Amino acid sequence: MTEPALSSANNALMQKLTGRQLFDKIGRPTRIVAPMVDQSELAWRILSRRYGATLAYTPMLHAKLFATSKKYREDNWSSLDGSSVDRPLVVQFCANDPEYLLAAAKLVEDKCDAVDLNLGCPQGIAKKGHYGSFLMEEWDLIHNLINTLHKNLKVPVTAKIRIFDDCEKSLNYAKMVLDAGAQFLTVHGRVREQKGQKTGLANWETIKYLRDNLPKETVFFANGNILYPEDISRCMEHIGADAVMSAEGNLYNPGVFNVGQTKNKEKIFPRVDKIIREYFQIVKECQESKASKTAMKSHFFKILRPFLPHHTDIRSTLATMNAKATWEEWEEQVVKPVEKVVQEIFEQPDIAIKDEITIGEKQSWGGSYRTVPYWRCQPYFRPVNGITGDKRVMQGLIDESVNKKRKADVPLESADKKKDVKA
């Protein structure tokens, strides 16, 4: 691959918006759909914006494949991605080669507001491919990746990182990323080892430490521990972040971003039948987006997670659906049956009582749990060491207390049952 032209690099730097300029230009978004592998695709971004999201990231895209494989691009990008209904938009890539990263980013720079480098993915595929959080020890390479985009793209470059156990090392890491040219910094408050059943609690205190000790002009996003809409404002206030990013919280309940609708359960805990129908219609309208239809089955399972154990016939049918199924088959075998069941539930004489959402006592982490009927979207409490539900928070606290003390002696803030999905 050839070196980028110097004149092109100079022009890009002259015209490029800095962090605060870009943040203002895209409307100062505060509620962000996280980059999620095979999950934050076009149709899901459109749905999330309808329910309060003000900025969205694409799924993590593999830079080398995107730059070199036409099929990969067609499977993951369409003419609708980055269109007027899909802005503001940040396109995220994983990479370990500056030239391939730049080549990939050049293909989308006219269809997005910024390009993000994934430095947070903790999954085995990232370890095997040598990208994401498995670059955390290679600061020279990370600096080169970011700086190459900073000097040669029309649009700004941003980055999403995880933290180290050591607060000072995390701070120096963040400073390096910013020095390389990142205009937005997203900090996921978990270390690389926190994934799956070891996800545990995101450390808001470490995120706050970074925010407090980085330049004030840094555009700073926090990621981790978002279960309900009020957690967003609580996170922003505690940390001083410009915005909050949600991954799994958004996947199981798009209403998590509806911060101005906290007394409207139809907005913050929407009925699964209505969300399924609305999302299905969006996917049909985005037929140019192969990624949207490919992701639909996975989204259905997440939206319907509390519902399916009560209606195993629908779960069995959904499990058999595949990419060859027609739109009519999806509607007749999945969408309509869900609608029928929920409609029957709402015809019950005591539905007003059954449909109540109760709020528990305030917890040590600052928020309260909700008891939500299974026919409404709601957070997913991922099991930890076989423990499910709210009890896993206490297990997380116990596990933390018996593990080695964090070098910076920073206490954990807030409790969470979600993990960052692949990004």
UniProtKB/Swiss-Prot annotation:
It catalyses: 5,6-dihydrouridine(16) in tRNA + NADP(+) = uridine(16) in tRNA + NADPH + H(+); 5,6-dihydrouridine(16) in tRNA + NAD(+) = uridine(16) in tRNA + NADH + H(+); 5,6-dihydrouridine(17) in tRNA + NAD(+) = uridine(17) in tRNA + NADH + H(+); 5,6-dihydrouridine(17) in tRNA + NADP(+) = uridine(17) in tRNA + NADPH + H(+). GO terms for molecular function: flavin adenine dinucleotide binding; mRNA dihydrouridine synthase activity; tRNA dihydrouridine synthase activity; tRNA-dihydrouridine16 synthase activity; tRNA-dihydrouridine17 synthase activity. Keywords: Acetylation, Flavoprotein, FMN, mRNA processing, NAD, NADP, Oxidoreductase, tRNA processing. SUPFAM superfamilies: FMN-linked oxidoreductases. Its cofactor is FMN. The keyword Plastid does not apply. The modification N-acetylthreonine is found at T2. Residues 404-423 are annotated as: Disordered. It comes from the Eukaryota. It holds the Pfam family Dus. Monomer. Catalyzes the synthesis of dihydrouridine, a modified base found in the D-loop of most tRNAs. Specifically modifies U16 and U17 in cytoplasmic tRNAs. Also able to mediate dihydrouridylation of some mRNAs, thereby affecting their translation. This is tRNA-dihydrouridine(16/17) synthase [NAD(P)(+)]. It comes from Saccharomyces cerevisiae (strain ATCC 204508 / S288c).
